[in-house]
Amino acid sequence: MSTSRSTRHQPGWGKPVRLMLRLMLMGVGLGVITGSALKLLAPQVEKGQLSLPSWLALPGSENAPAPGASTQPKAAAQPSSQPWGNSLGKFEAKREMTALTERWRQLAAQQKDLKVSAFMLVLDDGRFAALGADMPLPAASSIKTPILLATLELLDSGQLRWNEPLTLTKTVVGGGAGWMATKPLGTRFPTHEVATEMIRISDNTATNLLIERVGGKDVINTRFKALGLTATAVNNWLPDLEGTNTTSARDLARSIALVDTGKALSTRSRDLFREVMGTSVTNRLLPGGLLKGLGGEQGKPDDSLMIKGYRVYNKTGDIGIAYADAGLIELPDGSRAVAAFVVKGPFNDPRSTELIRDMAAAMAPVLQPKPAPRRTS
């Protein structure tokens, strides 16, 4: 009897190779599909409009859940409890602080022969006080604030360079405050120096140089009207001791607020505006009055206010028959207010400046922020 060997076919390498090729092709296909899907969905993930599953989010990324955290959909984020948030605020009077307005009225009534224009607005919530806020009065040097704004508008439009030289001519030489008038005709000053000296020491010749560079009185007045400064006008070269240049408390406050709320000027020019306004050396009216209301020492208003968390960027005016001061006030909680005062009265009458200080002092109670809540661990 013969024995027979099994004739069953022995498996070779064909099937495993084919299986591996199929798996590789499937992997490549799935990779292409997944990559294309992620590319299409990436913008939505980046904007937070679509959450990645926990197994796909990178550790430490915004979309990655904390260890042990629930993967259930999150409720919509609640608005910040911070009252001013990221808003720059608005020049919009919403709710009158009648007690402050009445206090101003009482102070003004004690000096019946003085004409008063006063305005204050908290940019972050719209609280305001006003007394004769739109009354046109002699602007004195307070008009230099809107002139600075008009100058920086040219910078933004590319019609002016910050280092452009301005030439001293006989037309623009002005008496009174400043040193530029003492230089020989033909002297050239860079625009940044002219603008700074106009605010820092209230140089009248510097102011006239900028009025001329903007295009003259008619052109700058047109710009004022376009900015909504309806009571503000340059009718004479500085120093304008006759008081023909006019403004109002609301206009002065508006010219500052338009910059700080981003309604006028670029971010860079806004920074220049603040930088220049911060150089003003006269601080006895608005800053001094505010410090008085806060109960501080009167030696150095700016330094004393800073210790208390306040900062005032202001510009004054003084032609004897009229005094003014207007500025941006930064408060300890980060919110901001604008305030302006213009008083017309007898020549060099100390009651005018004292009235501005008293009215500024009256603002202190409403500008003191509430204590910050204590953090709980």
Describe each PLM feature range.
Residues 2-114, 185, 192-195, 209-377:
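Penicillin-recognizing serine hydrolase domain
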Residues 155-197, 205, 210:
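Active-site-proximal loop and beta-strand segments within enzyme catalytic domains
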Residues 126, 137-168, 339:
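Active-site SXXK
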Residues 142-145, 200-207, 246-253:
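Short alpha-helical patches at coil-to-helix transitions and adjacent helical residues
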Residues 76-89, 122-132, 178, 201-203, ...:
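Acidic/histidine-rich, surface-exposed loop or edge segments in extracytoplasmic proteins
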Residues 102-104, 132-136, 150, 324:
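N-terminal post-signal-peptidase region of extra-cytosolic proteins
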Residues 109-136:
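Short, conserved catalytic-motif segment at the N-terminal edge
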